[in-house]
Amino acid sequence: GRYEEAYRYARQPNPLASICGRVCGHPCETDCRRGKLDAPISIRALKRFLTERHGPESRNPVTVYPGRTPGILRQERVAVIGAGPAGLSAAHDLALLGYPVTMFDTAPVPGGMMYLGIPEYRLPRDVLKAQVREILDLGVTLRLNSRLGRDFSLQSLRAEGFKAILLAIGLHQSRKLRVEGEDLDGVISGIDFLLNINLGYRFSIGKKVVVIGGGNVAIDVARSALREEQRSAAEQVAMKELMDVSRSALRMGARDVHLMCLESREEMPAFANEIDEGLEEGLKIHPSLGSKRFIGSQGRLTGIETIRCSSVFDAQHRFNPTFEPGSEAVLDCDTAILAIGQASDLSFLSPEDGVQATRQGTLSIDPDTFMTTAPGVFAAGDIAFGPRLIINAVADGKKAAEQIDRYVRGPEWRPRTRLVQISILDHHQMPESYDTYSRLPVPIVPLDRRTGIAEVEVGYSEPEAQQEARRCLQCWINTIFDGNEEEGTECILCGGCVDVCPEDCLQLLRVSEGSMMIKDETICIRCGLCAERCPVHTITMEAFETFDEADIRPELAEVTRD
C-alpha cells in the first residue's frame, strides 16, 4: 500500500513512466527472474497502476523530487531537436541539471512517434499530454512546426548561442517494398496512415484492406549487423506498427482487413496478446506470404499477387527468404498499407555541419559520448541506433544528457556517484503464497466496446495489482554464505539448509581440502528458509540497495543525474 513511494521508484529513473506503463515493450520482463520459474512479473501493468494513482495524469499527482526546486542554474543553452522519447528524456534531465533547454519539433504536437505513430486506443492522448506538460513545467521551451533544414540549421543554432545540440529526430520515413506497382494509388505507407489518423485527418481506404509487414525490416537489420537484442527490438517495433495499422484500419470502417507477412505464425515476434485481440476484432492473418507485385487498373490498386514463403531465415538466422514456385495467387483489395519499418530522413545535413552518417542511414556517433563527428553536436534515439523500443530511446536521452553536461562543464564535471547499502535482514519473510500465484493477465474491455479511440486495456484493480506485486522474488535480497571461524559462524556441515530448501537449489559437497556449497540461482525463490535453519548463522539474507550520493548530500543535487 506504499503507493506514493512505489511511484517515485518507478518515475524517478524514467521521465516517461506513465507512457511506458501503457505501451512499453517491457524488455525488463524478459530479464525478470520470476520468468525462470513460471511467468515474469507484469512490470508494465504495475507501473501503469502506480501512474494512474499518482502520475501527472492522475487526480492525486505527487512530487517526483521532494525538496528540489527546478530552475535555471546555468547560462549555457542546449538545443534538443526532436520532441520524441529521446528528446523529451534528455530535456527532462538537462532541465533538472539547471540548463536552459529549447526543444524543437517539426510536428504540430510534441511526442514524436508516440503521438504520431501509436493509436489512441493504446495510448490515450490525455496521458501523453500530461507527461509532456510535466517535462515542460521544468522550464523547457518548446518550438513546434520547426523543421531542421527548413526553418533553422545547425549553423543558425550555433549562431544563436547554443552551447550543445542534441539530434533526437527519430525515424519518420517509411521503407519501400521495391516491387512492381508500388506507385499505384491505393498503396500507402503505414507511417503515413497512422500519422494522418493521429492528427485527425480522415480518408477513404475502401472496404477491403491488406496490411503488409515483415521482410525489409529483417534484411535491414541483418545488413546492419546489429546485436541480437537490437535485432529483437527492431522486430518488435515493426510488429507493433503492423498490428497498430491493421487494428486502426478496422476502426476506420474497413469490413475486411487482412494482415500478411513473410514470417510464420511461430516466427512472429512475441506479442501474442495483441495478435489474439486483433483476431477477436475481425483481423485475418496470412502468415508465410510474400508480395510479388501490386496489380492495378487505370493507375488504381485492385489487388496483390502473393507468393507462398517457405522460410524466412537460413540456418544462421540470416534473412534469406525462399519462396514456393507455382504458389502465386491474387488477393483482391482496395488499399494496401506497407508496415515494413521506418527509415531516416537526413536531408537536413549539409557539408558545413560536419555531421556524418552511416551506411545504414543513422548518424555516426561515439557510442560512449553520444557525440557525432561535429563537436558539440550529439545524437540519441532511433536516429543514432536504428529502430528500437520507447524505453531504449528514454535511456539514450538520459545518457546523452549526462554526456552533454560533461561536455559543457569540462574539467569541473563530476561523474554520478552511486552508493551501495547492505543490510542484514533478521527473520526475512516473503508474502504469504507468493510462490503459488500465477501471473494475472492485464484486463481488457469487451469486444463490443473496442471501437474508435476507446482504450483496449483497462489496467489492474487494486487487489489485482497487489496480488501481482506479491509474486516478486525481491531480487535485491540475496542469500549470503560467509562463515567466520573467529565469530563462531563457520559452517558445521550439518546439511540443514539443503534439507529445508523447497526448490532443491542447494548442494553441499565435500572436496579434498574441505567442503563446497553450490547454489542454483535460477530457481531460488528467496524464501529464506536456509538462513532460518542455519544454527550458526553462516547463511544470512542481505538486502542490496543503491542510491545517488545526492540523496544523502543535498548540496550535490545540482550535479546529480537522476
Whereabouts are the PLM-identified features?
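Feature captures the FAD/FMN-dependent oxidoreductase FAD-binding
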Residues: 72-81, 129-180, 293-305, 310-313, ...
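FAD-site-proximal beta/loop scaffold in flavoenzymes
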Residues: 185-209, 215, 294, 314-387
